[in-house]
Amino acid sequence: MKTFYIVRHCQADGQSKDAALTPQGITQSHELAQFFSSIHLNQIISSPYKRAIQTTEPLAHAKQLEIKIDQGLSERVLSSKPIDDWYEKLKLSFTDLHMTCEGGESSQEAMNRIVEALHEQIKLETDHTLFVTHGNIMSLLLKHADPTLGFEEWKKLSNPDVYILKYFSPDHIEAKRIWQ
């Protein structure tokens, strides 16, 4: 069995790749470090987005771990252009995994990307890996573990949020929310 901790970034000021944590988000990042203080971690892997990296900096410092960057943990791009009904499109994308919007990534494509990042770590000897990522891509990884999960679970994610994912085999993955 391999253990993964999947973390959604703390509160941020916007959705761009360069969006930083808010003052509240910075406080949350320190609370997150405290939350993990008694949990053994071997490595931290983050999305390249600024808010994800800032989320894990206090934890990486406390654990004396390097923050590795993996593009596979980047947030899913629903569309490259603004869309008025993005909420409805996002909802539909949880049932129609192959639906795409202009310049965007389907749920299936995004799921494949984050599952590939997970499988790359499964191949290694390292256990107790922490991924820092984003809400939509995180919910797609959880949907991979449990196909009954979807849009409603995405709506319930908090900033930050933490799930433990236990990988026993390709057909046996358990995911559980552990953030209070």
Task: Give the positions of each predicted feature.
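Generic beta-sheet signal
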Residues: 4, 125-136
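Domain-level recognition of soluble alpha/beta enzyme cores
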Residues: 148-174
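Short, solvent-exposed aromatic-acidic interface loops
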Residues: 175-180
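Short beta-strand scaffold positions
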Residues: 46-47, 112, 132-133
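Glycine-rich phosphate-binding loop signature in dinucleotide/nucleotide-binding domains
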Residues: 38-40, 121-127
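Active-site-proximal alpha-helix that buttresses catalytic centers in soluble enzyme cores
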Residues: 2-67, 103-108, 160
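Short active-site segment of divalent metal-dependent hydrolases/proteases
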Residues: 12, 137-138
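Phosphate-handling substructures
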Residues: 61-116
